[in-house]
Amino acid sequence: MVRKICAVTGTRAEYGLLKPILLAIEQHPELEFSLVPCAMHLSNEFGYTIKEIQKDFKIDATVDMLLSSDTGSAMAKSIGIGTIGFSHVYEAIKPDLVLVIGDRLEPFAAAIAAVYMNIPIAHVHGGEITAAGVDEPARHAITKLDIHFASTEESAKRIIRMGEDKWRVFVVGAPGLDTILNESLQSKAKIARKYKLNLDNPLLLVVQHPVTTEVEEASFQMCETLEATVELGLQTVLIYPNADAGGRRMIKVIKKYEKYPFIKTFKSLSHIDYLSIMNQASVMMGNSSSGIIEA
């Protein structure tokens, strides 16, 4: 009997983690998946990254859930819209399992819909700690649901301490590293040519997201980072923040610094290009988890 997995992705970074899992599912004779992009993937404001997914896989459904507002209230409403959208998708697809990654509002909405429809949930990257924002409580809330694929032994132990049965917890490593290990990154020459960089000189990579419990500080925090960037004066690749509350305020600040010729800004990059630029960078600045895991 073939089991159908509904795989959910809402952001460019999350898709980079999900892709190697989907490739592994494709190779398994008793598994198949339906892929459901949502939220930032469908937004022109954040690079319309669904086009990158379409190069790799067939898309079975989408959930348009992202409100164009920069507040916690908008995030809460997006979760509600997403929960409704995913319930419709599950009714149509009838999955045996829902696969989600991490701690954002998109997997949270997908998990809420699944648990009330009695669909098992497989959660990757549970049991981890985030210093600030709503990410950690959201992650731990998802962690209370069904099957857990932890990236480290420490995360697995944390999940078990939260009361989850040991048989539900598996240590599988960080799937984002599979791409680094199994796929070829772009060459130094190709990255330099494509993004008009001089990689004989130091390169700074900046990726900073809003802290959702410090929304009012988002503009100031981005300004502080960019003032430091200007002070360094290195050629810089700067990628837009995510769509959480405060993200649009940060983008307004970023646009003021685009006047500096050594700062190149991008709404989004393909996962391979992002890893390739990271591989060439001398310094990475910001608060992206990729600066801890992939870097």
List PLM regions with ranges:
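Active-site and donor-binding regions of nucleotide-sugar-utilizing enzymes
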Residues: K4-T9, G16-E26, M65-K166
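Structural beta-sheet core signal
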Residues: A7, L35-P37, V100, H123, ...
